[in-house]
Amino acid sequence: MKQRHTIFVIWASVLFCMLCWLHLFVLQQNNGSHDHLVFWEFQVPRLLSAILAGAGLSLSGLLMQNLFENPMAGPYVLGLNSGASLLMALLVLGVAPAFINELSYVGAAMLGAYLAASLMFVVARRVQNVQSLLIIGLMFASFTGAIESVLQSYAAPEQIKQLLIWNMGSLQQMSAAQAPILSGIVLACIGVCLFLVKSLNALVLGELPALQLGIQVKKMRFLVLMLTALLAGSITAFCGPIAFVGLAIPNLARAVLKTQDHLYLILFTVLVGSCFLMAIDALILVLDPWMTLPVNVLTAVVGAPYVAYLMMKKR
């Protein structure tokens, strides 16, 4: 069985390398005199955005599904992106409380994601029904969206434009100078998760068996919550809210691997998540290299039917 899992991870790695090559050397060729500048300042950061956002959101979804013990959990569905978006909006529109004004965009988005995750975790402990939890997540997203709309009605045109562009989700927003920051956050979170594989596997068994195995469940859940908020918040800050990746990819990984071993789940989820967003961005480049089609449009086209299928399958 482990050999089968290893083969899937290897194939995902091969696909990852092929998409990187396709993205850099086939779809984004330039013939001008500034090839070197364009490559390092625009093409590489765009590719890194796809890789890091896909990997981070997928891993965030996997952690949330473990934490909530619910395969329908995800950073977008349960409102983490909405929490991050709200604090980002407060910061951009200049109406944030004083302590939030002291934060960077990344810090504000991370705080919003953490507060949203904490709220949904408390709700999940009281609401055992999957459909009810999803409805509450959607209500929270609608509530934060309504607050943003009210704030925008009093904002300057430039502020509204900045916020709308960011909310559409894009892999072109991150600059070359910002790339090391997001890379460090995502890679560090992946490393910590790989270190916690045994504890994550124990949490799958339930709270009591995990305690009997010597796992400090409360501390572990707090750590998972922090990692989830860090991943979802930082990616939302740099790329805007991106839907369905964190929900669909972990479920796809479980369906393919047919295991709860988080060593293979983490590796496969991270690779497939990166490949998914690289493929989405490649499709945008094929349609029109200069088109600013929001990433959320294509992730919704692919992700929404799969999520609907998952919900019907659970009924």
Name the predicted role of every residue range.
Residues 1-315:
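Alpha-helical transmembrane segments in inner-membrane proteins
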